[in-house]
Curated annotation (Swiss-Prot):
This is Phosphoglucosamine mutase. It comes from Acidiphilium cryptum (strain JF-5). Mg(2+) binds at residues 109, 250, 252, 254. One of its GO terms (molecular function) is magnesium ion binding. Binds 1 Mg(2+) ion per subunit. Activated by phosphorylation. PROSITE patterns: PGM_PMM (PS00710). It is an enzyme of class 5 (isomerase). The modification Phosphoserine is found at residue 109.
């Protein structure tokens, strides 16, 4: 049985930066200012001119958080480069390209507009480690008044006017030179989010016919009945327009979900399988495996095994996938939810670049997506959340015994995962296996035991 314990808890930072309801702690202007000061002080190392890149998605609250962060960084002595609405992977790329000390993205990813978040990237374009985030939190608790920049050492702010074009060119360069998408009709749903300009531009410049959805952000409609978490509109549009492929991004475009020409959804596991096969055939896959999380389907693991590839599993969160990839020299990883990290081209999940790799396979093989993108049959998988109060019941004797019994029933035909949520008082119970009825029974029984332990 896999039992995944949460990383050491921090007060503000979760698995993907700081996130919450806009204008409510921790997503207030005051906390954003404090964060800018603390992170700025931590990353003003050496005697060069220090710089931070700030990007955002299309939420209304971005207009509140962006100037607050800017003021904090300037007060710490850092120059601020404002990139405007751009995908998360674009900010990671620009952080490296501009030799910045830090990158900041203001986004709550796939969440509704009422939420917002802040995530930080180091000079290498990678998300900050848990330890570095803990250092920032500790600084935020201190009196920083005597450590901020002198009047003559304050930073400056400027806008990077060609930020979008730089990212479009970077994404296009992930395809082999000379490969074009002429003749392909693509439906693209940008979730009224950060990629609403750059993703259509990249596909159009590569020669595809692009039918767009979710490209009219108004500050309120990000992820609203659109994007990768609500792919039904994408599926319908693909069928209506007889498109070759549908591409749905989320609000900050770091994840992607696809639809084949029949409108059937293709999740992140299937995308990983396809890219792994293509990269292995081309000799571009580094190492002898790829990285995914504990949530990826056992069907993916078995398919990769047939190719002679291992599936390395990490806790949930694309940052942990990326860390494992770097530690083991692997260049492909991702999550079932659609985060796909191609380390040869990006340091974090990039929905557009992942979609381009799939389109490249369609061009080369000349077969429909329904044939190319369905390389394995997922095993039945069931996930249920159990809310508890008080102490976590995860390690109670009754739950441990019930989990061991469930694992024995799934031996050889499936697997079981129990993990505590890192952000809510929830126990996540996931089982998958060849027998759908058995999977459902195992989850029902375990949830009942957890609920009884919590109530007791």
């Amino acid at each position: 049985m896999n039992q995944i314990q949460p990383r050491p808890k921090r007060r503000l930072f979760g698995t993907d930066g700081i996130r919450g309801r806009a204008n409510t702690a921790p997503m207030t202007a005051e906390i954003a200012l404090r964060l800018g000061q603390a992170a700025g002080l931590l990353f003003t190392r050496g005697d060069h001119r220090h710089r931070v890149i700030i990007g955002k998605d299309t939420r209304l609250s971005g207009y509140m958080l962006e100037p607050a962060l800017t003021a904090g960084f300037i007060g710490a002595g850092m120059d601020v480069t404002l990139a405007g609405p751009l995908p998360t992977p674009a900010i990671a790329m620009l952080t490296r390209s501009l030799r910045a000390d830090l990158g900041v993205v203001i986004s709550a990813s796939h969440n509704p507009f009422e939420d917002n978040g802040i995530k930080l990237f180091g000079p290498d374009g990678a998300k900050l480690s848990d330890e570095t985030e803990a250092e920032i939190e500790a600084l935020m608790e201190e009196d920083l008044s005597g450590r901020l920049a002198a009047p003559s050492a304050l930073g400056r702010a400027m806008r990077l006017v060609d930020a979008a074009g730089r990212y479009v060119e970077s994404a296009k360069s992930s395809l082999p030179r000379g490969l074009r998408l002429d003749g392909l009709r693509v439906v693209l749903d940008c979730a009224n989010g950060a990629a609403y300009k750059v993703a259509p531009a990249a596909l159009w410049e590569l020669g595809a016919e692009v039918i767009t959805l979710g490209v009219s952000p108004d500050g309120f409609n990000i992820n609203h009945e659109c994007g990768s978490t609500v792919p039904s509109a994408l599926s319908a549009a693909v069928v209506k327009h007889r498109a070759d492929l549908g591409i749905a991004l989320d609000g900050d475009a770091d994840r992607v979900i696809l639809a084949d020409e029949r409108g059937r959804i293709i999740d992140g596991d299937q995308v990983l399988a396809l890219i792994a096969r293509a990269f292995q055939a081309d000799g571009r896959l580094s190492g002898s495996g790829i990285v995914a999380t504990v949530m990826s389907n056992l069907g993916l693991e078995r398919y990769l095994g047939g190719l002679g590839l291992a599936l390395h599993r990490t806790p949930v969160g694309d940052r942990y996938v990326a860390e494992h990839m770097r530690a083991h020299g692997l260049n492909l990883g991702g999550e079932q939810s659609g985060h796909v990290i191609l380390a040869d081209f990006a340091t974090t999940g990039d929905g557009l670049i992942a979609a381009l790799q799939v389109l490249a396979v369609l061009v080369r093989e000349g077969r429909p997506a329904s044939e190319v993108c369905r390389l394995f049959t997922p095993l039945p998988q069931l996930l249920r959340n159990v809310r508890y109060s008080g102490a976590s019941p995860l390690l109670s004797p009754a739950v441990t015994a019930a989990a061991a019994a469930a694992e024995a029933r799934l031996a050889g035909i499936g697997r079981l995962l129990l993990r505590a949520s890192g952000t809510e008082p929830l126990i996540r119970v996931m089982a998958e296996g060849e027998d759908e009825q058995l999977v459902a029974a195992v989850v029902d029984e375990l949830c009942a035991v957890i609920e009884a332990e919590s109530a007791g």
